[in-house]
């Protein structure tokens, strides 16, 4: 790129000096000299480059970069992540329910993401409800899976817009760049298959608010436009301009690095890919005003000198230097040969260094060769000193050159806001930090016995069941004891047989119940 400051194309433009501002103008072609009267002298209009005969000025509107515009153009957007929450329940024989939550991801659709974003921005409760975990269902002795899809919106997510090709740059994009946003495709892929990036506004061009409308004067000849006078009063040539789009707006990049959008019928080529434009900042505007003031001052000095010449009817070499054209283009050259005032048509070019026109002692280079002098006199106040050196009056005046150098130092190229292409997420932790899914972590929940009763009912039922079980145990133990006692008595009687003896009431020994019975019968 050859960044040349935008402003002094008149003073300094048309220079093929690799972007440097000229410090002087000198004819590269000089017509034949002819004598004139002092009343034919005139001061040039240094605010307009009268090149190629484009002297017709007409008002028009054009578009340029805003003052104070910063190269980084921020585009607000949001990320949309598709999340599937799965609830798995199992109910065992006694009614214990085990619930396990799992989370997976899916790639969302742009339309669904836009709807979810609108819900979130509007405070619609449907967005919050969509993030809740699914209500798990369950059935006895069965495993039940319940899934729910959610879209997690994270905003803002800011990307940098490249005004040259409308691409977006951010660390969330693959390789740090997204070029896919068009009318039909309004999203960007990210480093994660399940997350997409979308701009907050459907119209991406609204984020590129870097232009302003200005008024100026078009310099033309017929249908051809040679240049224009900008809003600040400086002339800018279209020579060497090329077509360049910024944020999709077609415009012209001038030789000094300025970008303007204007209607012209001129055939212009497209700029090379490496051509950038210069920023339009407050400092350059201030210096432009200083240069304009200096040009106006130079014109006033020229008019004062011209008035003095006409009034006194005398002219000097020093006064002729005020009549030199300060900008490139067609003009006049004046000199005095043998006490005769002479005039010649000339085409001025820019000079970057004094060595270009004074390569050696006594040599004034014009048109590629040393220009001859007449008795030590050249033209436009340039003379040959007594020591043989070429003397140029403007070599002693550096104020305008200081302004020009300040302007040159204030040129700031509008660079591509490229993000670091090597900053791509590689670690899992960085990935999770980027996603920031605002959902519960994967966890497992085991419930108590679920019989469909409230908590107090479950406690009453449990207490009653425990009491009934205790009473049942006591009853069974009692019954078991009563059954065991008669069985043991019968076994003992069967074991003695007839050897049982008893004692009667009279005190006699009776060997058996039968004997006792028969004796009783006898006694009776």
From Swiss-Prot:
Primary surface antigen capable of inducing and reacting with virus-neutralizing antibodies. Almost all human and veterinary vaccines are based on the functional aspects of the G protein. Residues 1-19 form the signal peptide. Glycans are attached at residues 56, 266, 338. It is a single-pass type I membrane protein. Residues 481-524 are intravirion. Disulfide bonds join 43-302, 54-226, 80-113, 178-188, 208-247, 242-271, 363-370. GO terms for biological process: entry receptor-mediated virion attachment to host cell; fusion of virus membrane with host endosome membrane. Changing residue 69 to R: In strain: Ni-CE. A lipid is attached at residue 480 (S-palmitoyl cysteine). Pfam families: PH_Rhabdo_glycop, Rhabdo_glycop_CD, Rhabdo_glycop_FD. Changing residue 229 to I: In strain: RC_HL. Glycosylated and palmitoylated by host. Glycosylation is crucial for glycoprotein export at the cell surface. One of its GO terms (cellular component) is virion membrane. Residues 20-459 are virion surface. Keywords: Disulfide bond, Glycoprotein, Lipoprotein, Membrane, Palmitate, Signal, Transmembrane, Transmembrane helix, Viral envelope protein, Virion. Changing residue 224 to T: In strain: RC_HL. It is found in: Virion membrane. SUPFAM superfamilies: Viral glycoprotein ectodomain-like. InterPro entries: PH_Rhabdo_glycop, Rhabdo_glycop_CD, Rhabdo_glycop_FD. Belongs to the lyssavirus glycoprotein family. Arg-352 is highly involved in rabies virus pathogenicity. Its mutation dramatically attenuates the virus. Attaches the virus to host cellular receptor, inducing endocytosis of the virion by using different host proteins including TFRC, GRM2 and ITGB1. In the endosome, the acidic pH induces conformational changes in the glycoprotein trimer, which trigger fusion between virus and cell membrane. There is convincing in vitro evidence that the muscular form of the nicotinic acetylcholine receptor (nAChR), the neuronal cell adhesion molecule (NCAM), and the p75 neurotrophin receptor (p75NTR) bind glycoprotein and thereby facilitate rabies virus entry into cells. Homotrimer. Interacts with matrix protein. Interacts with host TRFC. Interacts with host BST2; this interaction inhibits viral budding by tethering new virions to the cell surface. Interacts with ITGB1. Interacts with host GRM2. This is Glycoprotein. It comes from Rabies virus (strain Nishigahara RCEH) (RABV). The gene is G.
């Amino acid at each position: 790129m050859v960044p040349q400051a935008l402003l002094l194309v008149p003073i300094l433009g048309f220079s093929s000096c690799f972007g440097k501002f000229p410090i002087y103008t000198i004819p590269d072609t000089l017509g034949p000299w002819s004598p004139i009267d002092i009343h034919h002298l005139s001061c040039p209009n240094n605010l307009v480059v009268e090149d190629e005969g484009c002297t017709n000025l007409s008002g028009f509107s054009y578009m340029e970069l805003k003052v104070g515009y910063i190269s980084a153009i921020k585009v607000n957007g949001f990320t949309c992540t598709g999340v599937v929450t799965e609830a798995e329940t199992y109910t065992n024989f006694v009614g214990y329910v085990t619930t396990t939550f799992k989370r997976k991801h899916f790639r969302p659709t742009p339309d669904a993401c836009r709807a979810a974003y609108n819900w979130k921005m509007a405070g619609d409760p449907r967005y919050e409800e969509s993030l809740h975990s699914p209500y798990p269902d369950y059935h006895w002795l069965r495993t039940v899976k319940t899934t729910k899809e959610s879209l997690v919106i994270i905003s803002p997510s800011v990307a940098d817009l490249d005004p040259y090709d409308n691409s977006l740059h951010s660390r969330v994009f693959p390789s740090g760049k997204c070029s896919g946003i068009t009318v039909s495709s309004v999203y960007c892929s990210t480093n994660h298959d399940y997350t997409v990036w979308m701009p907050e506004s459907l119209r991406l061009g609204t984020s590129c608010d870097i232009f302003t409308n200005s008024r100026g004067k078009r310099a033309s000849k017929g249908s051809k436009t040679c240049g224009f006078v900008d809003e600040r009063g400086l002339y800018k040539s279209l020579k060497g301009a090329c077509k360049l789009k910024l944020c999709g707006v077609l415009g012209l990049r001038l030789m000094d690095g300025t970008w303007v959008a204007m209607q012209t019928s001129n055939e212009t080529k497209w700029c090379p890919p490496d051509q950038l434009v210069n920023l339009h900042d407050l400092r350059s505007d201030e210096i432009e005003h200083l240069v304009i003031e200096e040009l106006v001052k130079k014109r006033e000095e020229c008019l004062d000198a011209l008035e003095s010449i006409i009034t006194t009817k005398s002219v000097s070499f020093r006064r002729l230097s005020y009549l030199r054209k300060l900008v490139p283009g067609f003009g006049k050259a004046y000199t005095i040969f043998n006490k005769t005032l002479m005039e010649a048509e000339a085409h001025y070019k820019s000079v970057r260094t004094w060595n270009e026109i004074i390569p050696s002692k006594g040599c004034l280079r014009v048109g590629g060769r040393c220009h001859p002098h007449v008795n030590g006199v050249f033209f436009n106040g340039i003379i040959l000193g007594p020591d043989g050196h070429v003397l140029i009056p403007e070599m002693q005046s550096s104020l305008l050159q200081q302004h020009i150098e300040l302007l040159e130092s204030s040129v700031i190229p509008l660079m591509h806001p490229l993000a670091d292409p090597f900053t791509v997420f590689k670690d899992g932790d960085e990935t999770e930090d980027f996603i920031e899914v605002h959902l519960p972590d994967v966890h497992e929940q085991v419930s108590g016995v679920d019989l469909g009763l409230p908590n107090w009912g479950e406690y009453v039922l449990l207490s009653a069941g425990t009491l009934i079980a205790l009473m049942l145990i006591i009853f069974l133990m009692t019954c078991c004891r009563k059954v065991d006692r008669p069985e043991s008595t019968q076994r003992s009687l069967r074991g003695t047989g007839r050897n049982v003896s008893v004692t009667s009431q009279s005190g006699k020994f009776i060997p058996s119940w039968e004997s006792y019975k028969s004796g009783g019968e006898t006694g009776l």
